[in-house]
Amino acid sequence: MTIKSLALQCRDAAQVLSQLSADAKQALLLAMANALDTDATQILQANQRDVDAAREKGTGAAMLDRLTLTPARLSAVGAALREVAVLPDPVGQVTRDDVRPNGIRVQKVRVPLGVIAMIYEARPNVTADAAALCIKAGNGVILRGGSEAIHSNTAIARALQGALREANVPEAALTLVEDLRRETMLELLQLSDIVDLAIPRGGEGLIRFVAEHARVPVIKHYKGVCHLFVDASADVDLAVRLLVDGKASRPSACNSLETLLVHADIAERFLPAAAAALRARNVELRGDAATRAVLPEIAAASDDDYAAEFLDLILAIRVVPDLDTALAHIRQYGSDHTEVIATQTPANAETFVQSLRSAVVMVNASSRFSDGGELGLGAEIGISTTRLHSYGPMGLEALTVERFVVRGEGQVRH
């Protein structure tokens, strides 16, 4: 079957989804979560095939971490689906309701987007998360994962499609593209009369390919070059906690820290404490000359290091003379994802927040909170770095649009 035929079937199924009640969608998502539990053994076996193949190819540690499903991680995926199931249904929400002077009643109402193409790499959890969010919001979803996770994605999709069938919902509402040739992805991205939105999640190469070739609207989930700026007034212990959590808790995540900026007035107090805490977590440090004056044992950082999304236990460090220099550095090297300031000066915190265009800005909180679940959205479909209708972590509302519904009693415009 051609990709166009698959997309047409998904569009037809999306029409069925859009008519389901909130209760029906909740029951469907709970059944999908249960299906993951029922098929857990097969899913984990399929994932092991992908992990073994990736190891044989010499895949890096960061990619392997994103690819790997453990029983605990798979259980967490199911738990995320259950959380989405009980979230308020955005479809049908009235966001504006007023009566015009001529008597017509004007409402703005949330409706599903339609068909969403999710294009991603080695994150099998995205298969379930994206399906759950799209279906909860009444959308059909076309999933095109990476070849690294093909067995995992197929096993997860089959389990979820089984739940759709049992609920008498066309399984095409969740369509997994198994033809992973780039030509097929290119054809999918050209289907502007069928696909309403494409969301790429993955490496820079994938996102650039989608953005450059798509004829459908694209919301990019670009790389996360995330910074922590430690201001002169920062509480050292607090800042060290933010740094260790942001860098070492899960370095392969896009909301992990990649660069540390330290105000010169606090560098001699903060850097030794930070280095000791990071070394205990096996983090490699690279710094500029001012950093190495305090930490002479670390390697020198290059311009490429400051622009890098390491997704690994590596951190670039720079000492800056003031807040303005820190902001200029972030504007030059950042990716509009997530930025953090540690400070006890409210005015500096406000300047930091107002001066950056990043999707998420944190004050005295870990970058790892830049996540749909942590911000109260339930499972997220990704973190948008595109300034369109959604910016930052994308939950259910971001997968709907508002339209006008107008009710009258025969009014005409003269």
From Swiss-Prot:
Query: What cellular component GO annotations does this protein have?
Result: cytoplasm
Q: In which pathway does it act?
A: Amino-acid biosynthesis; L-proline biosynthesis; L-glutamate 5-semialdehyde from L-glutamate: step 2/2
EC number(s) reported in the record: 1.2.1.41
Q: InterPro entries given for it?
A: Ald_DH/histidinol_DH, Ald_DH_C, Ald_DH_N, Aldehyde_DH_dom, G-glutamylP_reductase_CS, Glu-5-SA_DH, GPR_dom
Q: List the disulfide bonds.
A: none
PANTHER family, alphabetically?
DELTA-1-PYRROLINE-5-CARBOXYLATE SYNTHASE, GLUTAMATE SEMIALDEHYDE DEHYDROGENASE
So what does this thing catalyse? L-glutamate 5-semialdehyde + phosphate + NADP(+) = L-glutamyl 5-phosphate + NADPH + H(+)
| CDD domains per UniProt | ALDH_F18-19_ProA-GPR
GO MF terms on file? glutamate-5-semialdehyde dehydrogenase activity; NADP binding
User: Where mainly located?
Assistant: cytoplasm
What's a Pfam family this protein contains?
Aldedh
Main role? Catalyzes the NADPH-dependent reduction of L-glutamate 5-phosphate into L-glutamate 5-semialdehyde and phosphate. The product spontaneously undergoes cyclization to form 1-pyrroline-5-carboxylate.
- Domain of life according to the entry: Bacteria
Where does the record place a coiled coil? none
Cellular localisation: Cytoplasm
Q: What class of enzyme is it?
A: oxidoreductase
Protein name according to UniProt: Gamma-glutamyl phosphate reductase
Species the sequence originates in = Xanthomonas campestris pv. campestris (strain ATCC 33913 / DSM 3586 / NCPPB 528 / LMG 568 / P 25)
User: Example GO biological process term?
Assistant: L-proline biosynthetic process
Q: Which UniProt keywords apply?
A: Amino-acid biosynthesis, Cytoplasm, NADP, Oxidoreductase, Proline biosynthesis
By sequence similarity, the record places it as follows: Belongs to the gamma-glutamyl phosphate reductase family.
